Amino acid sequence: MNIFCHALFLLLLGVVSCQNNNRNVKPGGKPAKKPNNPAIEATQHGPEADPNSGLAGAGDSSKETNPGGRGSSQQSASVNKPADDMKLHFLKNTAVTCNDGTAAGFYLKEFKGSKRWLIFLEGGWCCYSKETCDSRYKTIPRLMGSTDWPQTRRGSGLLSAQVDENPHWYNANIVFVPYCSSDVWSGNKAASKPKQGKETEYAFMGSQIIREVIKDLVPKGLKQAKVVMLAGTSAGGTGVLLNIDKVSSLLEQQGAEAQVRGLVDSGWFLESKQQKVPDCPDSASCTPADAIKKGLRLWNGVVPEKCKQQYKRGEDWHCFFGHKLYSYISAPLFVVQWLFDEEQLRVENIYMGSQSLSEQQWTYMQNLGKELKNSLKDVTAVFAPSCLSHTLITKSNWTDFQIKGTSLSRALQCWDRSFQEANKNSKTALKGCPFHLIDNCQWPQCNPTCPALIDQATQQEMTLLQVLASMGLDLQKLGLDVRGDISAGMVSNGG
């Protein structure tokens, strides 16, 4: 697998930054095989993980301590509060597995007395053929099996147990579901034969994993819940779109009376405007639509029935795109989406800071922001800043980002209050408490709270104009003021 493809896989992870402070264990409680790296870390892979990229969003990776290595156990015990950690539980139904046949599971941090549950689906793109799955298994095995999962994890952002980092949801029961099915949480296919030697017959059971997680949580208090939030980033966000109504129905069947809501972060993609290699032999050359078309057959993927009925046989891949699926979803949804999502740009071969940028690509970037904005206008609850980044809710500084003076944390709280005072489909915001927030300004980074752009070579912050100039754009020809900071003018435009 070439380095570009490997880097793309890492960029699409969208995983949570966590700390693990116990030894790895297998489902039976026996020590797992030792990984090549003795200090396994679950980190958020943002643009800074890409060797081909010269820019990163500041704050894309949360700071974390590394408990691995000799003599670190006592130190980590004093630094970390065990009560804040999520503990690993493997599924009771052992027939529902990860890609490689190892046990699937979830991490849980209970908050005694709480009737609110936050269930988070991890992201990580997908594989859609024997070749792409073999490459994925070789380079990122933890996204296809549970052998090296840590016994505990610590959440960040909306998954944090710290009130200052997570003021509205710190006191909820928090569940983190690791992504190990590579099927955008849609698969319904068991392996046809057991693993033989080095040859692996992959299972794709993402949809079933979610079902079994819900079943296993019912006796742990989920049945008594008043509010259940199914959240996810990137591929996990798309997984929320695909599974939210099924989760609601399953809980109803289990006798629960909870209101089920969905939170979709960076999982609202648009179809590519530029057709790439038709056969798309690897992830680097495959658009989301092409990957989903191929993957659906491999995964025996399941999409919401109401949406599926709108398309001809073999065309149900359309239901993976939020702007086409949204109107067929019954459960309330809150969509979080950067208007200039880095992964959406990468689909179009636009890599900020790592290559030249043509005038056509610059124009396309601006049009992308407009198209995304237009696709979100009828979404009841939305937070869409005009920034260059990918994923938001698991960043440790997630409360810093604002639109028109309102943070995402505040918008979520306003959305929560709206259920107590209004119909779920009402667009009437509570006075001074909005939850439909889309930046008005048209340019990338025109919101003053956007994550900073960092030059990876110098680690210095750069303005958007500096980035564009470094990529070869003639700013004067485009009518951009090279002498001043244009952000002030853009912000006054309503951002």
Curated annotation (Swiss-Prot):
Its EC number is 3.1.1.-. Glycans are attached at N397. InterPro entries: PAE/NOTUM. GO terms for molecular function: palmitoleyl hydrolase activity. Keywords: Glycoprotein, Hydrolase, Secreted, Serine esterase, Signal. Residues 26-39 have a biased composition (Low complexity). Residues 1-18 form the signal peptide. GO terms for cellular component: extracellular region. Specifically expressed in the muscle pioneers (MPs) during primary motor innervation. It is found in: Secreted. GO terms for biological process: motor neuron axon guidance; negative regulation of canonical Wnt signaling pathway; negative regulation of Wnt signaling pathway; protein depalmitoleylation. The keyword Glycoprotein applies. The active site is at S234, D341, H390. Its main location: secreted. Residues 24-80 are annotated as: Disordered. It comes from the Eukaryota. Belongs to the pectinacetylesterase family. Notum subfamily. PANTHER family: CARBOXYLESTERASE NOTUM2 (PTHR21562:SF10), NOTUM-RELATED (PTHR21562). Carboxylesterase that mediates deacylation of target proteins. Acts as a regulator of growth cone migration. Does not act as an inhibitor of Wnt signaling. This is Carboxylesterase notum2. It comes from Danio rerio. The gene is notum2.
